[in-house]
């Protein structure tokens, strides 16, 4: 079973957590090590269109996933980011939260991470030549999946 993520079909091998309403996946082109995505299962383009139960699940699970990736990737902080609409930089028409574990000095200026996220999915820079291999992504997902199997 594949997961729908806007115009993309996501293989189960790169999904490391699924709840009744949300799923978490590794990123094919991470801005920092451990950069993952959290999405509602229902393909909804804008945050305002999520139901209250979807919002609650999305953010409760985002909190759990953030805690795990911060620990696993030896971060000291986390950046959570959501681009909601084209003028906000959204390129995938499916609500999603970027979860990025952070470390001191990972960017020259702290806010440079937002510049990196802005160009992260631009069409001219989003080609398979820039993506990680399916094997690498599946291996990372397998490691992260273990944190949630209790």
From Swiss-Prot:
Q: Which Gene3D superfamilies match?
A: HIT-like
The catalytic activity, as recorded, is:
P(1),P(3)-bis(5'-adenosyl) triphosphate + H2O = AMP + ADP + 2 H(+); adenosine 5'-phosphosulfate + H2O = sulfate + AMP + 2 H(+); adenosine 5'-phosphosulfate + NH4(+) = adenosine 5'-phosphoramidate + sulfate + 2 H(+); adenosine 5'-phosphoramidate + H2O = AMP + NH4(+)
Active-site residue list: 96 (tele-amp-histidine intermediate)
GO terms for MF: adenosine 5'-monophosphoramidase activity; adenylylsulfatase activity; adenylylsulfate-ammonia adenylyltransferase activity; bis(5'-adenosyl)-triphosphatase activity; identical protein binding; nickel cation binding; nucleotide binding; ubiquitin protein ligase binding
Q: Which InterPro entries match?
A: Dinucleoside_ppp_hydrolase, FHIT, Histidine_triad_CS, HIT-like, HIT-like_sf
**Residues bound to substrate:** 8, 27, 83, 89-92, 98
PTM Phosphotyrosine: at which residues?
A: 114, 147
Important for induction of apoptosis, annotated site positions: 114
Q: Does the keyword Hydrolase apply?
A: yes
Annotated HIT domain ranges read 2-109
Q: E.C. number, please?
A: 3.6.1.29, 3.9.1.-, 3.6.2.1, 2.7.7.51
> GO CC terms for this protein?
cytoplasm; cytosol; mitochondrion; nucleus; plasma membrane
The UniProt PTM text for this protein says: Phosphorylation at Tyr-114 by SRC is required for induction of apoptosis.
Cite a single GO BP annotation: intrinsic apoptotic signaling pathway by p53 class mediator
- Histidine triad motif (motif): residue ranges: 94-98
Keywords, alphabetical: Apoptosis, Cytoplasm, Hydrolase, Magnesium, Manganese, Mitochondrion, Nucleotide-binding, Nucleus, Phosphoprotein, Transcription, Transcription regulation, Transferase
Q: Name one Pfam family in it.
A: HIT
Kindly indicate whether the keyword GTP-binding belongs to this entry: no
Q: State the SUPFAM superfamilies in the record.
A: HIT-like (SSF54197)
State where the protein is found: Cytoplasm; Nucleus; Mitochondrion
Subunit structure comment from the entry = Homodimer. Interacts with UBE2I. Interacts with MDM2. Interacts with CTNNB1. Identified in a complex with CTNNB1 and LEF1.
Record function comment: Possesses dinucleoside triphosphate hydrolase activity. Cleaves P(1)-P(3)-bis(5'-adenosyl) triphosphate (Ap3A) to yield AMP and ADP. Can also hydrolyze P(1)-P(4)-bis(5'-adenosyl) tetraphosphate (Ap4A), but has extremely low activity with ATP. Exhibits adenylylsulfatase activity, hydrolyzing adenosine 5'-phosphosulfate to yield AMP and sulfate. Exhibits adenosine 5'-monophosphoramidase activity, hydrolyzing purine nucleotide phosphoramidates with a single phosphate group such as adenosine 5'monophosphoramidate (AMP-NH2) to yield AMP and NH2.
- Would you tell me the protein name for this molecule? Bis(5'-adenosyl)-triphosphatase
